[in-house]
């Protein structure tokens, strides 16, 4: 027998008529309604809770919510475009979450405000997502000047969610001057993130496969920085070899330039970070 759930105006109560269903029950709290003006005031005052509500609003697929979301985005647009946007990609297991947590904490020490938009893969059958990135960045999530928002990809290709750009604008309006976007991490479809970021960083792990094959996947053509990760112990020499192999392989690719202001007259992109 399916358990009965009773709703009231003030509280969400439930009655489980069959204890066998207890492990399958999910109780969703009722969300208080906020006006667009309240959301804007909260965003600009640095209220993380209201920033989260605003992001939930733009992620909603309901028609009435879409109309409010459009109004909200129009109002906050003059306060956007003032951040450094960094996209971070890599195959699953490359250490993206660990890298972002450490990089984010380093940025905080320099006085930056950091927002992390973590995109989690969604089930192709049920469209659900675990959204576990925030738990993997526990220390960063406790920082006052850091904001972490996991979002499901919902099957959207490009390594990001279909509202990632709008979410980024909301974070900029909230005063976050560095936006880190962690992509799903599945391969060549992730190149869309390069179009909405200033810097596109690729985390490479040692022994990740033939470098020419990696270039065929397409993503290597779009990156600005290649970061060779998990370099410790016996892997140091392997990392140097991987760097040389990548440098040789990248000669087959056309150059990709962005309008960066260089702090040094030397160096060529993509840049490598490895011992």
Where is each model-derived feature located?
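Short hydrophobic targeting helices and cationic amphipathic motifs
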Residues: 7-8, 12-15, 19-22, 28
């Amino acid at each position: 027998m399916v358990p009965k759930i009773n709703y009231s105006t003030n509280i969400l109560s439930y009655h489980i008529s069959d204890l066998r269903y207890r492990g399958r029950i999910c109780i969703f709290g009722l969300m208080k309604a906020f006006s667009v003006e309240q959301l804007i005031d909260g965003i600009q005052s640095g209220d993380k809770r209201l920033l989260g509500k605003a992001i939930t609003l733009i992620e909603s697929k309901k028609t009435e919510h879409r109309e409010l979301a459009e109004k909200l985005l129009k109002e906050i647009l003059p306060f956007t475009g003032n951040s450094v946007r960094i996209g971070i990609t890599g195959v699953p297991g490359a250490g993206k979450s660990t890298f972002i947590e450490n990089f984010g904490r380093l940025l905080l020490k320099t006085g930056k405000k950091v927002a992390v938009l973590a995109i989690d893969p969604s089930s192709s059958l049920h469209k659900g997502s675990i959204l576990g990135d925030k738990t993997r960045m526990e220390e960063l999530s406790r920082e006052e000047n850091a904001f972490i928002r996991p979002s499901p990809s919902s099957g959207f290709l490009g390594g990001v969610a279909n509202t990632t750009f709008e979410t980024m604008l909301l974070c900029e309006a909230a005063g976050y001057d560095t936006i880190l976007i962690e992509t799903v991490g599945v391969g060549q479809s992730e190149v869309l993130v390069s179009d909405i970021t200033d810097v596109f960083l690729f985390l490479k792990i040692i022994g990740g496969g033939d470098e020419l094959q990696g270039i065929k996947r397409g993503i290597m053509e779009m990156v600005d920085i290649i970061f060779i990760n998990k370099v410790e112990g016996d892997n140091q020499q392997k990392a140097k070899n991987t760097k040389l192999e990548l440098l040789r392989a990248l000669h087959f690719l056309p150059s990709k330039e962005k309008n960066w202001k260089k702090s040094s007259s030397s160096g060529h992109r993509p840049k490598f970070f490895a011992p």
